[in-house]
Amino acid sequence: MDRAVNRVVLENEEREAKNTWRLVFRIAVLLLMVMTLAISAAALVYSMGASTPRDLAGISTVISKTEDKVTSLLSSKQDVIDRIYKQVALESPLALLNTESIIMNAITSLSYQINGAANNSGCGEPVHDPDYIGGIGKELIVDDISDVTSFYPSAYQEHLNFIPAPTTGSGCTRIPSFDMSTTHYCYTHNVILSGCRDHSHSHQYLALGVLRTSATGRVFFSTLRSINLDDTQNRKSCSVSATPLGCDMLCSKVTETEEEDYKSVTPTSMVHGRLGFDGQYHEKDLDTTVLFKDWVANYPGVGGGSFIDDRVWFPVYGGLKPNSPSDTAQEGKYVIYKRYNNTCPDEQDYQIRMAKSSYKPGRFGGKRVQQAILSIKVSTSLGEDPVLTIPPNTITLMGAEGRVLTVGTSHFLYQRGSSYFSPALLYPMTVNNKTATLHSPYTFNAFTRPGSVPCQASARCPNSCITGVYTDPYPLIFHRNHTLRGVFGTMLDDEQARLNPVSAVFDNISRSRVTRVSSSSTKAAYTTSTCFKVVKTNKAYCLSIAEISNTLFGEFRIVPLLVEILKDDRV
């Protein structure tokens, strides 16, 4: 609706501007015609009565005076034209931005009052500070000319840490998931009390908050609602998404190890939950026996979901039941993606054979590990109208953790490099009638992940692997035609080990100068990144939520790393 209103306003402004210029042109032409007639008449009169050179000299005097009048009139009209241009080109856009800020502030105030009255809690729907209006979920840098790698991250900035950390040596916080809408952000992670390798019991921390600007102009994330789901349910692999009703979350309910789950014949239980703006959490079990009837194991992709067309879209992956309709539909399908300027030397037939085998790794008993996308209607009823899309393996690699993102009008699926292909992948995604279609991906050759041989960071040939680590890229730089040019992200810059986290801006081939968390021996794991802009200052920032090793309190500490995106004009 906002987009339609903006389009109407712009069309009206363009129509008014055209009418104004047309009127100015007509007045100028009319004045010139009148002056021409006056000059002609004066010349005729003088020529008829002229008898001496002095009489003829008077004609030039009249003409000169007339020219002065015309020049004076045109100058006054030029002032009008200049004022019109200033109004249309400079002042009107600023006035519109101020009006938008006023409207958003009014909506914020009304939402607090209306929601507070409705739930008797005094709590309403939160909204980011006005400084961020137009700077969230947008194409932040539109540039056809500059080298992508001339943009680079600043040093990490000190800001309010909104993520709880372990409080004992045996505590474990892992698997962060983050999503941010134009009104609020959502964050979740898993909490294990007895070490990160315990699969039997865990808590799930879920929070809702907004972006604020301090009195000194610093960015900070303000948590407004949070809950620790500490019950008998063992929620795992959760993905979160910011929706108009709060924070929607999709989790699997796990009672066994991943390997045991793939050996089973029934799908994994899943739950759709929501933390509302009133701080209350509700959830509903999905009917996986119908929705995932062809699956033996199914998990959310860990990365954030996205709200698109009144539905929330989550990444999903898992194992297909052998010879089921979904499994049969993928039989013989494969795709081979190649490294930039680094061709695999293996024979083509061998590459194809290895690519096909990569979808059925031995670790999971030869089950086909499949990518999928689950969409659920967002309404006051949870788990409403779920629809599962299984993309063809002629587009996607072996199923893996992932994230669904929306930037501007474009949608993407990030797929973790769990298989042989190391560079980060972003599949363009289109949605229609509750289902999604994926297209050939953008690849970022220098944005790699560590992995075990033969699928290490520098690998270039198809192989069967379960490796890698989740490190998603965020679309940052676009062409004017809305195609993607560059991304921001935090990668683990090592061949095989989960070491050396660095943040950078990446194009399809190379990367910018990097910002390092610490030394190259620093242990790390998952990272998820999101970028936004403070419109008031026109500064772009990126947040990388990263699992960093923590030797004293727990194995990992989840740290929100904040950078400003700078530009080196010398590049």
From Swiss-Prot:
GO biological process, one term: symbiont entry into host cell
Gene Ontology MF: a single term: host cell surface receptor binding
GO cellular component, one term: viral envelope
Organism: Newcastle disease virus (strain Chi/85)
Spans through the membrane: 27-47
Sequence segments annotated as region (Important for interaction with fusion/F protein): 124-152
Topology Virion surface: residue spans: 48-571
Keywords in alphabetical order: Disulfide bond, Glycoprotein, Hemagglutinin, Host cell membrane, Host membrane, Host-virus interaction, Hydrolase, Membrane, Signal-anchor, Transmembrane, Transmembrane helix, Viral attachment to host cell, Viral envelope protein, Virion, Virus entry into host cell
Residue intervals annotated with topology Intravirion: 1-26
Subcellular location: Virion membrane; Host cell membrane
Keyword Transferase assigned: no
Biological role stated in the UniProt entry: Mediates the viral entry into the host cell together with fusion/F protein. Attaches the virus to sialic acid-containing cell receptors and thereby initiates infection. Binding of HN protein to the receptor induces a conformational change that allows the F protein to trigger virion/cell membranes fusion. Neuraminidase activity ensures the efficient spread of the virus by dissociating the mature virions from the neuraminic acid containing glycoproteins.
Protein name: Hemagglutinin-neuraminidase
Principal cellular location given in the protein's record: virion
